[in-house]
Amino acid sequence: MLKKPIKALKGKKVAIVAMGNSQLDYHMAITHSQEFDEVWVINAMIGVIPHPDRAFVMDPVSRFFESDDAGDMTDMMKRVLPTVKCPIYTCQLDDRVPALELYPIEPLIKKTECGYINNTVAYAIAFACWNEVGAIDMFGADFTYKGNLYFAEMGRACCEFWLAKCMERGIEVSIAVRSNLLDANIDLKDKLYGYHRLPDPIVSYLEDDKLKVCNFSDILKQNMAPVGIADRYDNNPTTWFDRNNVPSVASDPVEPKKP
């Protein structure tokens, strides 16, 4: 088990790819030549992303070999886990999976002074925080879906908490545009509650690594409608949802240009 952070990870750009729908934005990013120093995968993505650098499977892997608790993932994980070459961080070693490494739970909690980690994605984010990476790009970490308002997976708050800790430490955080993490998939005009009800809402967005705050009309005047990683070159428009869960089709995005 690691006792200290990995020096080689300090300042690196890392993609964390989980199993939600916004994993598609990772594939789009790779298609459009975006590069990462390391790619970390969550659970079943270990059988989807070729040659990941690290994996996080925080449940004991015995559940894949000795039960069907993982549902449809079971057969694939049983087949893939023994063949993986990269480190797989987990809570318990198992001879059937040679690549397993114990997650550095004690040194990480002591260094970050936080023991609030309630899902596997949060463990990966905490690992990035502990290792002082330079940038995190989140894909597939989707805990609720607009198409099913009565279903939500546990863990979104914990992930957002750890992302905030990362940002406080100067780590750049980017979220896939299809993900609801940090409200990434909410229309720009609806992100600031209360102001979203105004005829010309106040918005905030990132430009030249600095947060800008202005009226939405000012963005339109400057032809500065921000765009995300995916859908920049797609023929199919992205569907966005406002705070009332009403779908709206965004107009064709344009590349930002300086005034």
Residue ranges: model-predicted function:
Residues 1-259:
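Metal-ion/cofactor- or nucleotide/acyl-coenzyme-handling active-site neighborhoods
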